[in-house]
């Protein structure tokens, strides 16, 4: 009898472990299937700003009305909205689809950039969505904030804005705080840049920095080996002994990147003296 009890207890433990294993595997497989078939990619949130500002206007009107008259004002606004909605429905019946399409629209996007421009994926999807409807009569307004970062990441972000340019959709970039280096690479694509007086703009330059621990390793009798195939596979390293030849090659690559940056800006801003301003320095929006 005791044997049967112990056997049953052992069987219950094994069954519990098997169930737990199946649950874990199901979760992992489910997650991989979502990634494989593009589920869980997020969604676009589209907010009609006209209605938002109308609601704000009404709220302020009621808030600044004498308390004894607020209810009457609310009823008045509600009645006016119903009347306007009714008129719009009547008008809509007589308006052709082409007339609706001709109405100019402003699409407002946001880009808050970090060093790797990780928001570029969202920006790509947003611009794809806008381009399904936008025409040269419309406009895209991008609220941009970025101090720059990796060259290839911001090159990709800038190329997304170039898609609007190629479709002749006007682009305005608004800078409240900073659009420098890679951020300015994005901003220069725009037809117009609107910057706050003390917003930081520019920094058309390239920078690279790294520590070198080779002397520390030698001092502590630690050997470090770096094996490469290809003369310039590694130029400067953090742990190896850097050479003047490697340093010269690294600077050459920086200069080449800087030249590409200058060409990109001057193509989109032909009116500026690129050699004069592409010194890496920044300037303020009011300047």
Residue spans of the language-model regions?
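Active-site-proximal glycine-rich helix-loop-beta segment
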Residues: 183-192, 197, 285-287
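Residue-level detector of family-conserved "landmark" positions at structurally sensitive sites
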Residues: 174, 227, 275-276
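Small-residue-centered hinge/linker elements
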Residues: 1-169, 190-266
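Gly/Ser-rich catalytic serine loop of serine hydrolases
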Residues: 146-153, 172-185, 280
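Secondary-structure end/capping motifs
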Residues: 262-285
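Generic detector of short, well-ordered, non-transmembrane alpha-helical segments enriched
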Residues: 20, 107, 183, 284-285
């Amino acid at each position: 009898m005791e044997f049967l009890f112990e056997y049953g207890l052992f069987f219950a433990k094994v069954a519990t472990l098997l169930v737990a294993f199946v649950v874990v595997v199901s979760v992992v497989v489910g997650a991989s299937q979502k990634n494989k078939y593009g589920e869980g990619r997020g969604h676009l949130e589209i907010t009609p700003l006209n209605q938002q500002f109308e609601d704000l206007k009404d709220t302020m009107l009621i808030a600044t009305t004498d308390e004894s008259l607020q209810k009457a004002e609310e009823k008045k606004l509600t009645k006016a909205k119903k009347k306007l909605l009714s008129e719009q429905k009547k008008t809509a019946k007589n308006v052709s689809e082409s007339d609706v399409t001709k109405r100019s629209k402003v699409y407002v996007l946001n880009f808050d950039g970090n060093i790797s421009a990780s928001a570029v994926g969202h920006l790509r999807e947003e611009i794809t969505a806008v381009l399904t409807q936008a025409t040269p009569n419309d406009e895209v307004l991008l609220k941009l904030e970025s101090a720059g970062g990796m060259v290839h990441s911001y090159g990709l972000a800038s190329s997304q804005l170039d898609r609007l340019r190629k479709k002749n959709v006007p682009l305005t970039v608004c800078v409240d705080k900073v659009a420098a280096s890679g951020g300015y690479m994005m901003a220069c694509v725009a037809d117009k840049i609107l910057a706050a007086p003390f917003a930081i703009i520019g920094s058309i330059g390239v920078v690279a920095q790294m520590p070198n621990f080779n002397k520390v390793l030698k001092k502590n009798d630690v050997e470090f080996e770096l094996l490469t195939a290809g003369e310039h596979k590694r130029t400067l390293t953090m742990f190896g002994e850097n050479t003047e030849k490697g340093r010269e090659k690294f600077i050459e690559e920086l200069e080449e990147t800087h030249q590409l940056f200058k060409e990109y800006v001057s193509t989109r801003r032909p009116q500026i003296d690129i050699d004069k301003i592409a010194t890496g320095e920044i300037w303020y929006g009011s300047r």
